Every structure is written in C-alpha cells, then in structure tokens.
Amino acid sequence: MKCIDRRLIGDLIALSTVEGLSVTDAAEKLCLTRQGLYKLLRHLKKEGYVAEGPAIRLTQKGKDTLGIVLKDLLRYFNILSIRLSGRVVSGLGEGAFYMSLEGYRRAIEQKLGFTPYPGTLNIKLDPPSVVYKRYLDSLPGILIPGFSNGLRTYGAVKAFRAKLRDIEGAIVMPERTHHPTDVIEVIAPFKLREILGLRDGDRVEIEIYLE
C-alpha cells in the first residue's frame, strides 16, 4: 500500500465534518476563506477524493482513504466493537428473496460460518447510532462477493459479525439497497423475530464486531 499523505488525511477528515453543506457554509464552519476552500476542493476533485456538485461530498475513494485511517485508529485504541440501538421495523420483503439465493447463501456460509435464515431483521437506528453507522460505511468489513445467475447480476454485500442478545449473526450492507440510511439489516441462522419474540416497535441493541 502506498504511503498516505498526512495533509490529505487532515483535509479529508475536515471535509467529512461538513458533508452536505455548501462551500460558503463549509468555509465558515472550517474557519477558511471561500477562496481557500475552493482551491482545496478543486485539487481534491481532480484527484478523485471529492465529488462534483454544489454540496460537499466525499467520493468512495475519499471514504476508503479515511476508512484505512479509521481502522488503524480503532485498532490503536483497542475498540473491537460498537453497539447500535433502535427499533424493529418491517422490511420490504427483499431480505427473504436475497438470502434464499444460492450465490449469497454459499458465500455467507463460507465467509461467516453459518447458513442464513431466508430473511433479515430490520432495525431503524436511533439518531446517535446513525452517526456511528458511518464508521461501518468507511470500514472494509467482510466482503460477500456479487455473482450472476445468467439472467441477472447481483451486487456485492459488506458484512460485519454481530450479536443480538445471545444470538450470533451479522449485519449486511448491500451495494444496492432501497432501505434508508438509518436502517440496518441483520441476518442469523434463525428467524430472529420468532426466536427472540420481537415485534415492530420493540427496542433492541446490537453489538457489531469491527474485525
């Protein structure tokens, strides 16, 4: 892996705190002049770290670069897991379909060590937990590769091992999803709603392992 410029890391961390803001608002929050921020953004857009558009957005390249640093920091501070909390909500019915596909099922068995129940438990995160979910967006996780069945191509899925109460499972983060950003999907060898007696609206806390 090539060396990462320390100045670049500082710039990306600063910009991550103002994502979604206009240049004027971001410059004020970062205590920079508009001209200075425009100059920085031009350079980072040229290098592929920042997306084009009126609002400041990091590209996947920018997020991946921050993810490398975040992983090192988590290891340095011996942070092995995070806890997210929220309420159980009904899904769109997609989880049952995707978890029943042989391509995903076999990959999950190989990568995570269990056969997934054909369905997911959906949790709508509390606002503080949504912030911490961004850590997961930046970390590599466990890759469940995409595949094609000859008729359709299915995208890759990022996973993290997790524990809900006493049940070991994982959260899955598909490349393509119709869920809002404050919803996570949990898979396990069992139907979690049934074995844990969960209903819509029930509060839950899930521990997610970062390694």
Swiss-Prot record:
Residues where Mg(2+) binds: T120, N122
Region described as Riboflavin kinase: 82-211
SUPFAM superfamilies to which the protein is assigned, alphabetical: Riboflavin kinase-like, Winged helix' DNA-binding domain
Pathway: Cofactor biosynthesis; FMN biosynthesis; FMN from riboflavin (CTP route): step 1/1
Similarity remark: Belongs to the archaeal riboflavin kinase family.
Organism, scientific name: Pyrobaculum islandicum (strain DSM 4184 / JCM 9189 / GEO3)
UniProt record, GO biological process: FMN biosynthetic process; riboflavin biosynthetic process
H-T-H motif-like: annotated segments: 1-81
Name of the protein in question: Riboflavin kinase
Gene Ontology MF: a single term: nucleotide binding
Protein keywords: Flavoprotein, FMN, Kinase, Magnesium, Metal-binding, Nucleotide-binding, Transferase
EC top class, as a word: transferase
Organism ancestry: Archaea, Thermoproteota, Thermoprotei, Thermoproteales, Thermoproteaceae
Binding site for CDP: G91, L92, G93, E94, G95, A96, F190, K191, L192, R193
